[in-house]
Curated annotation (Swiss-Prot):
<dbReference type="InterPro" id="IPR044893">
    <property type="entry name" value="RNA_pol_Rpb1_clamp_domain"/>
</dbReference>
<feature type="binding site">
    <location>
        <position position="462"/>
    </location>
    <ligand>
        <name>Mg(2+)</name>
    </ligand>
</feature>
<feature type="binding site">
    <location>
        <position position="895"/>
    </location>
    <ligand>
        <name>Zn(2+) 2</name>
    </ligand>
</feature>
<dbReference type="GO" id="GO:0003899">
    <property type="term" value="F:DNA-directed RNA polymerase activity"/>
</dbReference>
<dbReference type="InterPro" id="IPR012754">
    <property type="entry name" value="DNA-dir_RpoC_beta_prime_bact"/>
</dbReference>
<dbReference type="InterPro" id="IPR007083">
    <property type="entry name" value="RNA_pol_Rpb1_4"/>
</dbReference>
<dbReference type="InterPro" id="IPR007080">
    <property type="entry name" value="RNA_pol_Rpb1_1"/>
</dbReference>
<dbReference type="Pfam" id="PF04983">
    <property type="entry name" value="RNA_pol_Rpb1_3"/>
</dbReference>
<comment type="subunit">
    <text>The RNAP catalytic core consists of 2 alpha, 1 beta, 1 beta' and 1 omega subunit. When a sigma factor is associated with the core the holoenzyme is formed, which can initiate transcription.</text>
</comment>
<keyword id="KW-0240">DNA-directed RNA polymerase</keyword>
<dbReference type="InterPro" id="IPR007066">
    <property type="entry name" value="RNA_pol_Rpb1_3"/>
</dbReference>
<dbReference type="GO" id="GO:0003677">
    <property type="term" value="F:DNA binding"/>
</dbReference>
<dbReference type="Pfam" id="PF04997">
    <property type="entry name" value="RNA_pol_Rpb1_1"/>
</dbReference>
<keyword id="KW-0548">Nucleotidyltransferase</keyword>
<feature type="binding site">
    <location>
        <position position="898"/>
    </location>
    <ligand>
        <name>Zn(2+) 2</name>
    </ligand>
</feature>
<keyword id="KW-0479">Metal-binding</keyword>
<keyword id="KW-0808">Transferase</keyword>
Length: 1399
């Protein structure tokens, strides 16, 4: 019996739960929560401050105001616990029960819940199949609705206004039932027979033809099934009982002066209670219908305002004219419950202060002001003082600390020893924004920060502040030390390169000490060892830059760990020999035998990490920093006005450009060039002039003349301070130097267009008033952009984190063979990213074979490290298939093999790593560096001139890819396809460069030809789009009638006449439907066919085409018969920077997307409609042709009779990612999105590993759309989680039933976040009301799989060290499953026990 009582006691406390369910509350449920009914609107007696009985703060209902004390004071203290006072009716208990005890209000008339009414789509409306307006008219007492038509001609659900209602009453008397208000709607909802309706809808859907109707029906069906499956009843959406929030959650606080500060909810509840009581009274008095009706409507409005103020009509405002904060407002938005209190909380044991530089610290240390340390570690100090017996009580210890006695400082030092603290700088954009350090006590009030971690924090010392947090528990200290210590975070999680890299003065110092100078003091000396170099340098006998010979001993550690020692004499400089002293053993001397620029230093640290490991790298980084500081001090590099050397050629270049501009102006004045052409030419001219000036300036700055030892004149790299700063990468760039000593160049107007007159002056010469004024545009725009950008970038990061937060590595290997095709990323002829770089840290999906043989070079399942990369380069492998997050088949989470290397650690990723969040941070963190437009250069405009040829950069063999071409009489090839590419391969067959060839390009080489570097292999006219013949024959004009479809134009300059096809808009009525074309016939006038088809050879001419041949002319293969001018002056505004990244991740459909071929086949054109062309693709296999209507103004890339492949571009424009996924599949989509996003980041010089983008993409591809439901319960057109469909299909195929068929769907990140399985995560992201409404109706369960959900319920997250806790919990639970008891079993056991004891 005793055990049973314990069991019952434990039933009340829910500690262990696996899921959270949200559902509609039935009236019984609400009453069961309640501790009594609130009957009066009174709150607190203003004189006694005691709660009024039966009011909103009633102590009888909600519990005592003071701990263990009833209201009248009869029972006090703990011994009366649980007694209910007979005088005031209050139970003696803790006062905090007032935070959990609820009450209720019995409503005199039912009221609709506004969320289920107004949150779109309206759930009540969908169930009743009525429009929202109709339902509102019923609820707010404007119309009657027929509930039971009886034997009359009325229909159920029909709306009647007052007149119609009274007419019907006269006609039918009491045979029918029509009412208004929420009661009527409730009655209709009660009458719904869900099972019957579901069956009816399931039958109706397959028989319907119209798409819209099917959509509507399946929406209803889904909702009905949701109600049916969740155990919610439809009538529960209408409230008959209203729950009242516990009073301590809506406090009322007396202020001095007899006023009260109160929560808005109290006002809203008061309003409801007042109206409810008034309505009860009116009903008792059986008042006239119209008055009762008005009161009911007011009650409905009061409840609406309480639940969601402002959702319908005007928001109810308080005394201060502000809208009152309703229950819905409490939970949504940045200040709501989810984001303010559940996902983010305030922390104790923290402090903040200004940071300052700590050049003497080691990498794992930070300087903590004594004052701060004393405050932060107080409890530890108290404990220690007591333990030592220095203080008898905590109070005494407190006094000692307050007096700051000397022994307190000793204790503090002891407490702090090896107790790491966390330093955080806001904004924390990635995980390196919080790192752990060992504190070093310092005087002063500023925190000292190690200079090398500034890059990770993005900190500088111009007044930045940082926060300090103390990890208290042993576990927290352990994690801080093992995972968050600054020494463990040398590599950036975004790209796997060192982030602990010297910058600014350290770089300058190292660069200065490793530069060489001709004829410096001590040149030509030979030294026996490094120590001798050191001595001679210290004695002042040799300059830092002197070229000398040194004998060095080096220990070289190979990749495989073998160590070789050797001694050799090297040509080097004194400075480099000194630098080699601090390089760790195992590194070759060659790494420092060069000027140490920023890139070289970064490479050096990276190499050091891969060769000798973490510990030595950390020590080395510190040494580099100390050395750099020392030598930049010695160097004395400063900047003075005479460092800005202006090139002598500047005046000449500018004069020449001005002359040419005058020439163009005069051409424009005499009407030879148009305004647009003039503008373009002038801007091109000035761009070129600017480049020339900056070239001359850099040539001038970067070299200087000196006399060498023999007395001859020699040239060496300049020691100009400004040049050294830029060249070393310490500060500044060529673009900035150009503005200081070259010319500022072209400027942009606020609307982004470029001003024709450039600023020819530079800052050294000074700007005149006009020039200064032009500059202000860019500067102001830069500042405005920066402010906007920060907010936008933060929002992008938030969306990314939200979509990827539940992606965690959950297993080692999912066993898939799928993967992505990797090739080197080639752009405009340059290898932007070699294959080795792209596959580094990835796992190979299928064996890599030696080119041309079956020998396996790299077996599948290999994790590619630096050694393998060299091997791949060596064997000139061109393509590899690698595992990718996108193709990973793990159900929940992702597997380690598909992810590959953990970039921040350099080995295969651990189970439990939260790769989704890392990906989101890596992409979001550089967001603030991306442009809206450029900022630092001050809006100086940049423009490139149009490309019109292919110039080969490396010699090699020509390869033509995907190129359809015809051969001209002179042997040149003419491209007649759009997607053709020309590549140059080296002797190993590795691709070195690749170029796109536009339609009509004339190619002067053939497949397999050898070319030398610098050869021009293809040419085209960038300003026109040609139409090329594919055969020899005679031209005949079809439908080309002068001034009806064509007009002849005479060129004023040359006197030649051109035939121009008129735009259909400008044609007379007779010519609207005529399609001008050029037909090819043979010498006898017989129609020629296109080669390989039975389509007659005729070329239709689009509007504005210029025809270049005469009727009846003989032409050859590859001749251009017409040209279509392309507008280049109005360059299409390409969205760049942050907005472009956001568009790609949101998977937005571009405005005028490129049109892709839906199937493979032959192109023809059908009958035209108004403003549209009908494009027909006839498949080669004889199945049904595909038709599409395309607007006339779209320029088509295909001609009648051309063969296209599925997914080929028919009309140019920005690509639509949804089309790519549908026609070309997931890996083509991945390639497109990864490349597009990388292009934006690459432009800013930001490196992000591809797999981060793929990780986000995996989350965007979670959903599938059902195309055939098979034997599953899915409905065609439903969007489901891929994992759900796969599980269902596995079950079906096990039972030998038909599986559901589906297609993958791409969702934007916002949509993907909102449609995740976890409603807690979705609700805390955006659109809280909508998410919760939907979740409640469907009775959703949240299985707490992601990180956010667990943070909200206050658990450890299922990632990292928390994963162990979760799997342990699961293991324990599985072990003790049978012990769990249901409530029914308890009841049965109880009755049995009672019966047996009764006997």
């Amino acid at each position: 019996m005793k055990d049973l009582l314990n069991l019952l006691k434990n039933q009340g406390q829910i500690e262990e739960f696996d899921a959270i369910k949200i559902a509609l509350a039935s009236p019984e449920m609400i009453r069961s929560w309640s501790f009594g009914e609130v009957k009066k609107p009174e709150t607190i007696n203003y004189r006694t401050f005691k709660p009024e009985r039966d009011g909103l703060f009633c102590a009888k209902i909600f519990g005592p105001v003071k701990d263990y004390e009833c209201l009248c004071g009869k029972y006090k203290r703990l011994k009366h616990r649980g007694v209910i006072c007979e005088k005031c009716g209050v139970e003696v208990a803790l006062a905090k029960v007032r935070r959990e005890r609820m009450a209720h209000i019995e409503l005199a008339s039912p009221v609709a819940h506004i969320w289920f009414l107004k949150s779109l789509p309206s759930r009540i409306g969908l169930l009743l199949d009525m429009t929202l307006r109709d339902i509102e008219r019923v609820l707010y007492f404007e119309s009657y609705v027929v509930i039971d038509p009886g034997m009359t001609t009325l229909e159920k659900g029909q709306l009647l206004n007052d007149e119609q209602y009274f007419e019907a009453l006269e006609e039918f008397g009491d045979d029918f039932d029509a009412r208004m208000g929420a009661e009527a709607v409730r009655e209709l909802l009660i009458q719904i027979d869900l099972e019957h309706e579901i069956g009816r809808l399931r039958e109706e859907i397959p028989q319907t033809n119209s798409e819209t109707k099917i959509k509507k029906l399946s929406k209803r069906l889904k909702l009905m099934e949701a109600f049916h499956g969740s155990g919610n009843l439809p009538e529960w959406m209408i409230l008959t009982v209203l729950p009242v929030l516990p009073p301590d959650l809506r406090p009322l606080v007396p202020l001095d002066g007899g006023r009260f500060a109160t929560s808005d909810l109290n006002d809203l509840y008061r309003r409801v209670i007042n109206r409810n009581n008034r309505l009860k009274r009116l009903l008792d008095l059986s008042a006239p219908d119209i008055i009762v009706r008005n009161e009911k409507r007011m009650l409905q409005e009061a409840v609406d305002a309480l639940l969601d103020n402002g959702r319908r009509g005007r928001a109810i405002t308080g005394s201060n004219k502000r809208p009152l904060k309703s229950l819905a407002d409490m939970i949504k938005g940045k200040q709501g419950r989810f984001r303010q209190n559940l996902l983010g909380k305030r922390v104790d044991y923290s402090g903040r202060s200004v940071i300052t530089v700590g050049p003497t610290l080691r990498l794992h240390q930070c300087g903590l002001p004594k004052k701060m340390a004393l405050e932060l570690f107080k409890p530890f100090i108290f404990g220690k003082l007591e333990m030592r017996g220095m203080a008898t009580t905590i109070k005494a210890a407190k006094k000692m600390v307050e007096r700051e006695l000397p022994e307190v400082w000793d204790v503090l030092a002891e407490v702090i020893r090896e107790h790491p603290v966390l330093l955080n700088r806001a904004p924390t954009l990635h995980r390196l924004g919080i790192q752990a350090f060992e504190p070093v006590l310092i005087e002063g009030k500023a925190i000292q920060l190690h200079p090398l971690v500034c890059a990770a924090y993005n900190a500088d010392f111009d007044g930045d502040q940082m926060a300090v947090h103390v990890p208290l528990t042993l576990e927290a200290q352990l994690e801080a030390r093992a995972l968050m210590m600054s020494t463990n975070n040398i590599l950036s999680p975004a790209n796997g390169e060192p982030i602990i890299v010297p910058s600014q003065d350290v770089v300058l110092g190292l660069y200065y000490m490793t530069r060489e100078a001709i004829n410096a003091k001590g040149e030509g000396r030979v030294f026996a060892d490094l120590q001798e170099v050191d001595r001679v340098f210290r004695a002042g006998e040799a300059s830092l830059h002197a070229r000398v010979k040194v004998r060095i001993n080096e220990t070289i550690k190979d990749r495989d760990g073998s160590i070789t020692k050797n001694t050799r004499i090297v040509d080097t400089t004194v400075g480099r020999a000194l630098l080699f002293q601090i390089v760790p053993e195992g590194m070759s001397f060659d790494v420092v035998n060069q000027p140490m620029k920023k890139k070289a230093i970064s490479k050096l640290i990276n190499l050091c990490y891969r060769t000798v490991g973490l510990k030595d790298t950390v020590i080395f980084a510190d040494q580099l920093m100390y050395t750099g500081f020392a030598y930049s001090t010695i160097s004395g590099v400063s900047i003075g006005v005479n460092d800005f050397v202006i090139p002598d050629e500047k005046a000449r270049i500018i004069d020449a450009a001005t002359e040419e501009v005058k020439e163009i102006e005069s051409q424009y004045a005499s009407g030879l060039v148009t305004q647009g052409e003039k503008y373009n030419k002038v801007i091109d001219l000035w761009s070129k002039a600017n480049d020339e000036v900056s070239k001359a300036m850099m040539a001038n700055l970067s070299k200087e003349k000196v006399i060498d030892r023999e007395g001859n004149e020699a040239e060496q790299d300049s020691f100009n301070s400004m040049y050294m700063m830029a060249d070393s990468g310490a500060r500044g760039s060529a673009a900035q130097i150009r503005q200081l000593a070259g010319m500022r160049g072209l400027m942009a107007k606020p609307d982004g267009s470029i001003i024709e007159t450039p600023i020819t002056a530079n800052f050294r010469e000074g700007l005149n008033v006009l020039q200064y004024f032009i500059s202000t545009h860019g500067a102001r725009k830069g500042l405005a952009d920066t402010a906007l950008k920060t907010a936008n970038s933060g929002y992008l990061t938030r969306r990314l984190v939200d979509v990827a937060q539940d992606l965690v590595v959950t297993e080692i290997d999912c066993g898939t063979e799928q993967g992505l095709h990797m090739t080197p990323h080639i752009e405009g002829g340059d290898v932007v990213e070699p294959l080795g770089e792209r596959v580094l840290g990835r796992v190979i999906a299928r064996d890599v074979l030696k080119p041309g043989t079956d020998d396996v070079l790299v077996p599948a399942g290999t994790l590619i490290d630096e050694q393998w990369v060299d091997f791949i380069e060596l064997n000139s492998i061109d393509e590899v298939i690698v595992r990718s997050p996108i193709s990973c088949e793990t159900r929940y989470g992702i597997c380690a093999k598909c992810y590959g290397r953990d970039l921040a650690r350099g080995h295969q990723v651990n189970i439990g790593e939260a790769v989704g969040v890392i990906a989101a941070q890596s992409i979001g963190e550089p967001g603030t560096q991306l442009t809206m437009r450029t900022f630092h250069i001050g809006g100086a405009a940049s423009r490139t001139s149009a490309v019109d040829n292919v110039l080969v950069k490396n010699g090699g063999t020509i390869r033509l890819h995907n190129l359809k071409h015809v051969e001209r009489a002179d042997g040149a090839l003419v491209a007649v396809s759009r997607s053709g590419e020309l590549a140059v391969a080296d002797d190993f067959g590795r691709e070195r460069e690749r170029y796109k060839l536009p339609y009509g390009a004339v190619i002067s080489v053939k497949e397999g030809d050898k070319v030398d570097a610098g050869a021009v292999v293809a040419k085209w006219d960038p300003h026109t789009h040609p139409i090329v013949t594919e055969m020899k024959g005679v031209v005949t004009f079809v439908g080309m009638e002068e001034n009806i479809t064509i007009k002849r134009q005479t060129d004023e300059l040359t006197g030649l006449t051109n035939i121009e096809v008129m735009d259909p808009k400008d044609r007379p009525a007779a010519g609207k439907d005529i399609r001008p074309a050029i037909k090819m016939v043979d010498a006898n006038g017989k129609e020629l066919l296109l080669p390989g088809t039975d389509v007659p050879a005729q070329y239709f001419l689009p509007a504005n085409a210029l025809v270049g041949v005469a009727d009846g002319a003989e032409i050859n293969v590859g001749d251009v018969i017409a040209r279509i001018p392309q507008e280049t002056s109005k360059t299409r505004d390409i969205t760049g920077g942050l907005p472009r990244v956001a568009d790609l991740f949101e998977a937005r459909r571009p405005k005028e997307p490129s049109i892709l071929a839906e199937i493979s086949g032959t192109i023809s054109f059908g009958k035209e409609t108004k403003g549209k062309r009908r494009l027909v693709i006839t498949p080669t296999d004889g199945s049904d042709p595909y038709e599409e209507l395309i607007p006339k103004w779209r320029h088509l890339n295909v001609f009648e009779g051309e063969q296209v492949n599925k997914g080929e571009v028919i009309s140019d424009g920005p690509s639509n990612p949804h089309d790519i996924l549908r026609l070309l599949g997931v890996s083509a989509l991945a390639r497109y999105i990864v490349n597009e996003i990388q292009d934006v980041y690459r432009l800013q010089g930001v490196k992000i590993n591809d797999k981060h983008i793929e990780t986000i993409l995996r989350q965007m591809l979670r959903k599938v759309e059902i195309t055939e439901s098979g034997d599953s319960s899915f409905i065609k057109g439903d969007q489901m989680e891929l994992t759900q469909v796969l599980e269902e299909n596995e079950r079906l195929s096990a039972e030998d039933k038909f599986v559901a068929k589906y297609v993958r769907v791409l969702l934007g990140i916002t949509k993907a976040s909102l449609s995740t399985e976890s409603f807690i995560s979705a609700a805390s992201f955006q659109e809280t009301t909508r998410v919760l409404t939907e979740a409640a109706v469907t009775g959703k369960r949240d299985y707490l799989r992601g990180l956010k959900e667990n943070v909200v319920v206050g658990r450890l997250i299922p990632a990292g060290t928390g994963l162990a806790y979760h799997s342990e919990r699961k293991r324990k639970r599985d072990a003790e499953k049978p012990v769990r008891v249901s409530a029914d079993e308890v009841e049965a056991a109880l009755t049995e026990a009672l019966n047996s004891s009764g006997n």
